[in-house]
Regions:
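Non-catalytic interface/linker regions that flank or bridge core catalytic/transmembrane domains
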Residues: 1-135, 139-140
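Histidine- and acidic-residue-rich, metal-dependent catalytic cores
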Residues: 87-304
Length: 304
């Protein structure tokens, strides 16, 4: 059976029947061959080829390759997830420091982090989500940003959102709490209950995030909306604007689910991490706070 796939879907063991696109000048002197060399696979993925036709009777299929990719050892997945997190933390920290100091934000760096998280989520999604659940007090905001971005990617893909929308979700998840740089660390890192005055200060962070990012002309409306309204609730009891139901765009409703889910399932100095099931069951009991259709779909997507 012949199947037309994108170059980034190819894997070793596939039989290449035809190459569609500008492949002249590449080192593929033939267009029908068994892909057995990692070097050829990398060259083909990096080429200007638009489509590749594979013959599943002579080589492996995409489905087989996907299974093989998912079957990476648990140790390999954990290693990759840890590496992604460790590489991302200083980059996110630098973005937040620029925001704190009033500097122009390096959005290209933020997109680099998004791309790294997206790549890791393709074959190590469970490991990455697990790794980000253990958060040191002074790193909570940075790891929470990675976790929410990862959850948004995972959920967006599971409900078949476009690649562009998923990337937008991820950027919103990564930057949604950047406004917390305006909040004193002693409030953010407080292990006990916040006073009323402290709570008012904390609740200013969505508006802070919006104002910081609004200074950049290349931030989409959806990302700005995620930053400003991720604490809104469908029953109208959220903040800062008390939006109700459909007044909250779907991307923001997804962000609110991922934001709360990560907070509940994260291990902190003052609380144990909740299980995924317990977190979603708790959220389902919060009548009217979350989009129930999206929340149930999110719950199903987390059944790794």
């Amino acid at each position: 059976m012949l199947k037309r796939i994108k170059p980034d879907e190819i894997h070793l063991g596939m039989f290449i029947e035809a190459i569609d696109g500008n492949w002249k000048g590449q080192r593929f002197w033939r267009s029908r061959f068994l892909l057995a060399s990692p070097e050829e696979a990398d060259t083909l993925r990096a080429s200007r080829v638009e489509w590749v036709v594979i013959n599943t009777e002579k080589g492996t299929d995409v489905a087989f390759a996907d299974v093989k990719a998912r079957c990476l050892s648990a140790e390999a997945q954990l290693t990759r997830a840890l590496k992604t997190v460790e590489q991302s933390k200083p980059l996110i920290k630098s973005i937040f420091e620029d925001a704190r100091d009033g500097n122009s934000l390096p959005i290209d760096v933020a997109m680099q982090v998004v791309d790294d998280i997206e790549a890791c989520m393709r074959d190590s999604s469970q490991a990455l989500i697990q790794v980000t659940r253990l958060k040191a007090r002074d790193e909570y905001t940075f790891l929470h940003s990675i976790a929410v971005a990862a959850l948004m990617i995972h959920f967006g893909r599971s409900i078949k959102m476009t690649d562009a929308t998923v990337k937008e979700l991820a950027l919103g998840g990564l930057l949604h709490d950047v406004g917390k740089v305006k909040i004193p660390p002693e409030i953010l890192q407080k292990s006990g209950p916040l006073t009323d005055a402290e709570m008012i200060t904390v609740r200013q962070h969505p508006q802070n995030s919006f104002e910081i990012l609004s200074r950049h002309g290349n931030i989409s409306e959806a990302v700005l909306d995620i930053c400003l309204h991720h604490h809104e609730r469908t029953d109208g009891k959220g903040y800062p604007d008390g939006l109700l139901g459909e007044e909250i765009r779907p991307q923001v409703r997804i962000a609110s689910i991922c934001d709360v889910y990560d907070a509940l399932t994260s291990r902190r100095a003052y609380k144990k991490a909740w299980t995924s099931d317990d977190a979603v069951k708790f959220m389902l009991k919060q009548e009217g706070q979350f989009d129930r259709v999206l929340l149930r779909n999110f719950f199903y997507s987390m059944k790794f």
